[in-house]
């Protein structure tokens, strides 16, 4: 089996396993599957769970797509690849819980291959996961980062620190001067050693559930009211702003003629903006600002 097919098989299995785990913890709703084809090449399967007991919406998509020419978003940092043919596969997910005390989360693992005249000119892995709480709890954030550190440990002492820093820098809303959440891991252009890099991608993909599900279990029965729900919807606006303004995956998908429904499944089903909103000083809502600054979460 060639390298691309090995990655592809892992990713389809990862999607299956995450869906099964989410359905189990939700206990009510199930994923609906949408199989799709892309005219320019390839296709995928998008799965959406809606109106569950825990999740308002959970979307997880697998895609294996190809094209005759790299779009600008993919070659901006690699100008030598401009005009190359390409093929990419990946799994991307975003989960929006009902309860404002459960953080929203995002994860992505992907593999990209570029060719010219039938010869591979570049191939690399990318991905990571990040956490966006509305009412953060130190215990949860520390668990998230300690899980990330543990899965990084076999790949060198600097791996966690480097990819945590990259995550803090990437998921930053410059126009708001704040991070999107409390970070996690982010990496791209990892293509020096296929076996080692593929092992790391698997560690990140497999580690996501270990990082997220214990937080869901701890917070899913926390009581909340209209004020917490309103704040959750307001903060979801930041999620929308980042995805539509900065996210390279979203831009790549749209610029490459990707399937808009699947690309935009990350957006929350409900969201609100409020002009000039400021939380009351000392309130639980005001505490969030202290978490939207990069810091050491290992304790």
Swiss-Prot record:
Q: Which residues are substrate-binding? A: 92, 108-110, 257-259
Native organism: Xanthomonas campestris pv. campestris (strain B100)
SUPFAM superfamilies the UniProt entry points to: Coproporphyrinogen III oxidase
* InterPro entries linked: Coprogen_oxidase_aer (IPR001260), Coprogen_oxidase_aer_sf (IPR036406), Coprogen_oxidase_CS (IPR018375)
Per the UniProt entry, the disulfide pairs are none
Reported EC number(s) for this entry are 1.3.3.3
Top EC group:
oxidoreductase
Instruction: Give its localization.
Output: Cytoplasm
Q: What is this protein called?
A: Oxygen-dependent coproporphyrinogen-III oxidase
Q: Which GO terms describe its biological process?
A: protoporphyrinogen IX biosynthetic process
Give cofactor(s), names only.
Answer: a divalent metal cation
Query: Is Transcription regulation given among the entry's keywords?
Result: no
Per the Swiss-Prot or TrEMBL record, the active site comprises 106
Task: Provide this UniProt record's keywords sorted from A to Z.
Answer: Cytoplasm, Heme biosynthesis, Metal-binding, Oxidoreductase, Porphyrin biosynthesis
Chief place where the protein resides? cytoplasm
> Where is the site labelled Important for dimerization?
175
NCBIfam families noted in UniProt: PRK05330.1 (NF003727)
Annotated spans, Important for dimerization:
239-274
State the oligomer form and interacting partners: Homodimer.
Q: Which reaction does it catalyse?
A: coproporphyrinogen III + O2 + 2 H(+) = protoporphyrinogen IX + 2 CO2 + 2 H2O
Q: Which family does it belong to?
A: Belongs to the aerobic coproporphyrinogen-III oxidase family.
């Amino acid at each position: 089996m060639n390298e691309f097919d090995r990655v592809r098989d892992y990713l389809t299995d990862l999607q299956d396993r995450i869906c099964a785990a989410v359905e189990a913890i939700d206990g009510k709703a199930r994923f609906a599957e949408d199989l799709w084809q892309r005219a320019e090449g390839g296709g995928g399967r998008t799965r959406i769970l809606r109106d569950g007991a825990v999740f308002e919406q959970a979307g997880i998509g697998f895609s294996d797509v190809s094209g005759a020419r790299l779009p600008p978003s993919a070659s901006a940092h690699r100008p030598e690849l401009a005009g190359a043919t390409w093929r990419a596969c990946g799994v991307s997910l975003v989960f929006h819980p009902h309860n404002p005390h459960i953080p929203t989360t995002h994860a992505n693992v992907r593999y990209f291959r570029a060719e010219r005249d039938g010869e591979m000119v570049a191939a690399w892995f990318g991905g990571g996961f990040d956490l966006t709480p509305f009412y953060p709890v130190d215990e949860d954030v520390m668990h998230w980062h300690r899980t990330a550190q543990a899965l990084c440990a076999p790949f060198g002492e600097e791996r966690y620190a480097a990819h945590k820093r990259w995550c803090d820098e990437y998921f930053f809303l410059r126009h708001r001067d704040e991070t999107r959440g409390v970070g996690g891991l982010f990496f791209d252009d990892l293509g020096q050693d296929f076996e080692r890099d593929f092992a790391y991608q698997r560690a990140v993909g497999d580690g996501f559930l270990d990082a997220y599900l214990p937080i869901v279990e701890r917070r899913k029965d926390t009581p909340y009211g209209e004020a917490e729900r309103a704040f959750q919807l307001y903060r979801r606006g930041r999620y929308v702003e980042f995805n539509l303004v900065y996210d390279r995956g979203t831009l790549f998908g749209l610029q490459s003629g990707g399937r808009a429904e699947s690309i935009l499944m990350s957006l929350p089903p409900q969201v609100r903006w409020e002009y000039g909103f400021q939380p009351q000083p000392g309130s639980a809502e005001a505490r969030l600002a202290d978490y939207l600054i990069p810091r050491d979460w290992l304790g």
